[in-house]
A protein has these predicted regions:
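Beta-strand/loop substructures that line and gate deep hydrophobic ligand-binding cavities in soluble
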Residues: 3-6, 144-191, 195
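Glycine-rich portal/gate segments that line the openings of hydrophobic small-molecule binding cavities
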Residues: 56-62, 90, 100-147, 199-211
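Short amphipathic alpha-helical segments
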Residues: 75-81, 124, 185-192, 196
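Hydrophobic pocket/interface hotspot
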Residues: 79-82, 89, 132, 168-170, ...
C-alpha cells in the first residue's frame, strides 16, 4: 500500500487506508469514517467543521482507491435529498455533464453519468452506467459499474451524524482501461472528489436556506 505524498493543510493530511474489500460494506464505510475521526482527534486540536480529509491508495494494475470526507453542520436529511436527486446532479456537480435515471426497482436504481474534463487544450469524456443501492436507514448509497469506460468503478456515499456535526464520506475504487493515462486520472480524481463534496454541501445548504 502506498500513500500519496501531497501537501495538505491541517485536517486534510493523508491517513493510511486499511486494506478492505471493495465495494465497502456499510460496516466498513462506517469504520473508514471512524478512522478519519480518530486521526483528527490525534491532532493537537480536533478538526473544525467545514474541513476536508482525504486519502488515496495505489493498488496493482493501475487501480486507485480514494476516500474523501467533509465535516459540516447540516441536517443529514438535506444531504440525502441532494444525493438521491439523480436527474439533477449534473446541475451542480462540476464536470458532470449528464446524470440520467434509467430505471428503479425498489431501493435499487440504474443511473447513466457522463463526465468531461479539459486537459492541455483537449476535452476528454467518460461514461458509466451505475447500479446504486439505497440504504436510507444507514444513510448510505453504494454503487457499482455495470458498463462504461473503466474496468472498475465502484464505491459508496456515507452520511454520518453525531454531537460534533455531520459528515459526508465518499469512497471510490477506480481502474482505468488499457491505454488510459493513470497518472492523469489520479491527479484529476484527487482534485475533483473534494470539489464534488463541496458541491453537494453547497446545494444542500441552498435548499435548506430556501425553506
Amino acid at each position: 500500500m502506498t500513500s500519496v505524498d501531497v501537501q495538505l493543510p491541517r485536517c486534510q493530511r493523508l491517513i493510511p487506508l486499511p486494506l478492505l474489500e471493495s465495494p465497502l460494506s456499510g460496516r466498513q464505510s462506517a469504520a473508514l469514517a471512524a478512522l478519519f475521526d480518530s486521526a483528527s482527534r490525534g491532532e493537537a486540536e480536533q478538526c473544525a467543521l467545514d474541513t476536508i480529509q482525504q486519502e488515496m491508495e495505489r493498488l496493482p494494475q493501475g487501480t486507485r482507491r480514494l476516500a474523501v470526507q467533509l465535516r459540516m453542520e447540516l441536517d443529514p436529511a438535506w444531504l440525502w435529498a441532494v444525493l438521491t436527486d439523480y436527474a439533477n446532479l449534473s446541475r451542480f456537480i462540476p464536470n458532470l455533464e449528464i446524470s440520467r435515471l434509467l430505471w428503479r426497482r425498489a431501493n435499487v436504481v440504474g443511473l447513466e453519468q457522463v463526465g468531461a474534463q479539459s486537459f492541455m487544450g483537449m476535452r476528454f469524456k467518460a461514461r458509466v452506467e451505475l447500479e446504486l443501492t439505497e440504504h436510507p436507514q444507514e444513510q448510505r448509497l453504494s454503487f457499482t459499474m455495470n458498463k462504461g469506460d473503466f474496468r472498475r468503478f465502484e464505491g459508496a456515499w456515507q452520511i454520518g451524524h453525531d454531537a460534533s456535526g455531520t459528515t459526508l464520506l465518499y469512497e471510490l475504487t477506480v481502474q482505468g482501461c488499457v491505454g488510459m493515462p493513470i497518472a492523469l486520472i489520479e491527479q484529476r480524481l484527487r482534485e475533483d472528489l473534494a470539489a464534488n463534496l463541496r458541491a453537494v454541501q453547497q446545494e444542500a445548504l441552498r435548499r435548506a436556506a430556501a425553506c
